[in-house]
């Protein structure tokens, strides 16, 4: 069994249940950083409905194309896909109700840059969710050596200008960190942030 296989993944990870933990709801905007083929982005689009929006960012153009193809077959017109590196891609400023990382924060070459961009994209009242592998032996998954434990991931998130709300275990092999923007660390104060699009929420939703 491969943890990259979307179909087998459904046997050990429930996207809808995990999204439910974040408070994401109808009319909300979610940015899925490292979206792959849309394992979380497509369920989120169903939840968001026609008044919401989901943007998936991934460096793998083929995966983004498959996500958009599946969205089209379902009639999900509220899904957008962007091919790009998380370190270099910012789709808006202060537009997102939810910035989502689905078992991938450990994969980025520079997670500090990625989280810096997340801080700029999230709304003042929005949420960042980091779902990732526990740093322990599991039947499959990425090498333990590249995984972040909960404390390391939480420290990176705090350093990017967030306040940790809670850390939860997600059986069988994961943890989930929910964080909110720290008003004492406003966006734009972090040197690791890269330039990108600078759309307001209203412009983004047009």
Please place each PLM-identified region on the residue numbering.
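Conserved beta-strand signature within the Rossmann-like core of class I S-adenosyl-L-methionine
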Residues: 125-132
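A short acidic, Gly/Pro-enriched loop at the edge of an enzyme's catalytic core
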Residues: 87-98
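A short SAM/SAH-binding and catalytic strip from SAM-dependent methyltransferases
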Residues: 97-110
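Conserved alpha-helix/loop element of class I SAM-dependent methyltransferases that forms part
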Residues: 9-29
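A short glycine-rich, Lys/Arg-flanked "PGG" loop and its adjoining helix->strand segment in the class I
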Residues: 112-124
């Amino acid at each position: 069994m491969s943890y990259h296989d979307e179909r087998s993944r459904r046997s050990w990870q429930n996207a809808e249940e995990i999204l439910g933990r974040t408070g994401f709801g109808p009319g909300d905007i979610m940015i899925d950083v490292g979206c792959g083929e849309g394992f979380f982005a497509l369920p989120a689009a169903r939840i968001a409905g026609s008044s919401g929006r989901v943007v998936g960012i991934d460096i793998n153009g083929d995966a983004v194309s498959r996500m958009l193809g599946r969205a089209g077959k379902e009639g999900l017109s509220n899904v957008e896909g962007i091919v790009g590196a998380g370190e270099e891609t910012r789709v808006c400023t202060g537009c997102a109700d939810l910035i989502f990382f689905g078992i991938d924060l450990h994969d980025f070459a520079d997670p500090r840059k990625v989280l810096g961009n997340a801080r700029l994209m999230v709304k003042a009242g929005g949420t960042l969710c980091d779902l990732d592998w526990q740093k322990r032996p599991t039947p499959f998954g990425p090498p333990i050596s590249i995984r972040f434990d909960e404390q390391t991931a939480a420290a990176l998130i705090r350093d990017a200008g967030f306040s940790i709300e809670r850390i939860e275990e997600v059986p069988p092999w994961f943890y989930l960190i929910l964080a909110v923007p720290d008003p004492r660390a406003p966006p734009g104060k972090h040197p690791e942030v890269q330039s990108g699009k600078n759309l307001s929420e209203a412009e983004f939703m047009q």
